[in-house]
C-alpha cells in the first residue's frame, strides 16, 4: 500500500522533516546552542528530542537545506527579473576560527542589494592576485560600471584592469585623516587641560596671598618685609600665569584651526558637482604655507586619488560610501556571535543562513514594496 508519509518523514527517522529543519529556520532568526534548540523544540512540540539528534540532523542535512533555499531564492529573483545594476560594493573582513585567521570576501549590488559572491578563505591565500581573481570571477557576465571600496592599495590597479570606475568610500577617506588627527587633537586637549589646571592653581595662590595682605595701591613699606615678599610672590605668580595664558592661547588656536580644516575637508564631499568639489579641494591645497602639517600631508596624499574620491559627482548612481557592505557584515555575521563558532563549516553555514534572510528581506521584499508603490 502506498502512503504519503515519505513527504514528511525520512526513512528510518523518528521525527518529521519540519522538526529536523527546525534548527535551520531558528538559526536564521537568532543563535541558540544545540541544548537550547532541543529545549525549544521539546517545549513547543511536546517532544523529547535530544541535543545529539539536533546536532546529527544539522550535520546530515544543513548543506542540502541551504542549497535548496538558495536555489528557491534565485528562482524567485529571476522570476521578479531583478538584475545586477552594475554598481557594486566590495570589502573583506577578518574572522578568527579556532585560533586560525580567515578572510571573508564579499561583493554585493549597491542598488538591488543582491549578494553577488561571499566566500571565506585562509589568510595565507589572501593577496592582490586573489582579490583580482575573486572580482573577475564574480563579475563574469554581469553589467559593470562602478566598484565602491575602501582605500586598500591593491584596489585601483585591479579595478582599472577590470575596466570599471572606482569610488573610494568617503567614510574611509575621512578615517585615514581622523586616525592621526585624533591623536593630535587629544594631545592638544591634554595640554590645554594641564595648562588650565596650572593657571587655576596659580590664581588660587594669588588669591590666598591677596587675602593675607590686601594692599590697595602701591608697594608696602620696605620695613614690612612679609608684605613685600607677599607682593613679590604675587608678581612672580602673575608673570608665570601670563606665560601659561600665552601657551594656552597658542594651543587653543592650533586646536580650533585643525578642527576647522577637518570640517572643511569633510564638507568637500557634501557638494554634488565635480567643479565645486575640486575647486574647494584645490583652494585648501593652495594654502600650503598656512596649513598644519598633518592637514597638508593628508591633502597631498588625497590629491593623488582625488578622481576616485569624487567619482560620485559625475554619476548620481554611485554611492559615496561603502556603508551598505559594512551593514551587511554586521547583519549576516555580527560580532557577538563571531567567537562562538569553532569550524569553518559552522561559520560558512551560519553566514549562508543569514545571507538567505538578507536576500529575502533586502532584495525580494524591497523589490516587491517598490513595485507596489509604483
Q: Where are the regions a protein language model picked out?
A:
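Inter-helix linker motif
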Residues: 162-186
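Short small-residue beta-strand/loop micro-motif enriched in glycine and branched aliphatics
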Residues: 4, 113-118, 340-341
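Alpha-helical residues within the helix-turn-helix
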Residues: 39
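Short, polar/flexible loop-turn hinges at active-site or ligand-entry regions and domain interfaces
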Residues: 141-143, 166, 188-193, 342
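Solenoidal tandem-repeat scaffolds enriched in leucines and small polar residues
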Residues: 183-194, 201
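RNase H-like nuclease fold core
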Residues: 10-18, 25, 29, 34, ...
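Basic, low-complexity segments
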Residues: 1-13
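Acidic/histidine-rich catalytic cores and adjacent linkers
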Residues: 149-156, 161, 197-374
Amino acid at each position: 500500500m502506498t502512503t504519503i508519509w515519505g513527504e514528511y518523514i525520512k526513512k528510518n527517522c523518528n521525527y518529521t522533516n519540519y522538526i529536523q529543519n527546525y534548527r535551520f529556520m531558528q538559526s536564521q532568526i537568532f543563535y541558540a546552542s544545540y541544548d537550547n534548540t532541543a529545549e525549544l523544540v521539546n517545549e513547543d512540540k511536546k517532544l523529547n528530542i535530544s541535543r545529539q539528534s539536533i546536532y546529527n540532523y544539522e550535520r546530515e542535512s544543513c548543506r542540502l537545506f541551504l542549497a535548496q533555499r538558495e536555489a528557491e531564492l534565485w528562482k524567485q529573483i529571476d522570476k521578479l527579473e531583478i538584475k545586477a545594476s552594475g554598481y557594486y560594493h566590495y570589502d573583506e573582513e577578518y574572522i578568527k576560527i579556532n585560533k586560525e585567521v580567515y578572510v571573508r570576501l564579499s561583493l554585493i549590488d549597491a542598488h538591488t542589494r543582491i549578494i553577488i559572491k561571499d566566500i571565506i578563505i585562509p589568510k595565507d591565500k589572501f593577496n592582490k592576485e586573489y582579490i583580482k581573481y575573486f572580482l573577475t570571477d564574480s563579475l563574469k557576465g554581469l553589467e559593470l560600471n562602478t566598484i565602491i571600496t575602501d582605500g586598500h592599495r591593491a584596489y585601483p590597479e585591479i579595478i582599472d584592469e577590470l575596466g570599471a570606475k572606482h569610488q573610494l568610500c568617503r567614510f574611509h577617506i575621512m578615517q585615514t585623516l581622523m586616525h592621526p588627527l585624533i591623536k593630535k587633537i587629544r594631545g592638544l586637549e591634554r595640554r590645554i587641560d594641564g595648562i588650565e589646571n596650572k593657571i587655576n592653581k596659580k590664581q588660587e595662590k594669588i588669591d590666598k596671598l591677596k587675602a593675607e595682605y590686601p594692599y590697595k595701591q602701591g608697594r608696602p613699606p620696605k620695613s614690612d618685609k612679609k608684605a613685600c615678599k607677599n607682593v613679590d610672590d604675587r608678581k612672580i605668580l602673575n608673570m608665570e600665569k601670563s606665560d601659561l595664558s600665552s601657551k594656552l592661547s597658542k594651543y587653543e588656536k592650533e586646536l580650533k584651526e585643525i578642527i576647522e580644516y577637518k570640517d572643511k575637508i569633510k564638507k568637500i564631499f557634501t557638494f554634488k558637482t565635480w567643479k565645486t568639489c575640486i575647486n574647494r579641494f584645490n583652494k585648501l591645497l593652495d594654502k600650503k604655507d598656512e596649513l598644519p602639517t598633518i592637514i597638508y600631508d593628508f591633502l597631498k596624499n588625497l590629491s593623488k586619488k582625488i578622481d576616485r574620491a569624487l567619482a560620485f559627482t559625475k554619476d548620481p548612481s554611485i554611492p559615496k560610501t561603502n556603508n551598505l557592505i559594512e551593514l551587511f557584515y554586521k547583519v549576516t555575521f555580527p560580532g557577538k556571535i563571531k567567537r562562538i563558532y569553532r569550524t569553518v563549516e559552522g561559520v560558512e553555514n551560519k553566514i549562508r543562513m543569514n545571507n538567505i534572510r538578507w536576500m529575502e528581506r533586502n532584495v525580494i521584499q524591497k523589490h516587491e514594496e517598490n513595485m507596489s508603490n509604483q
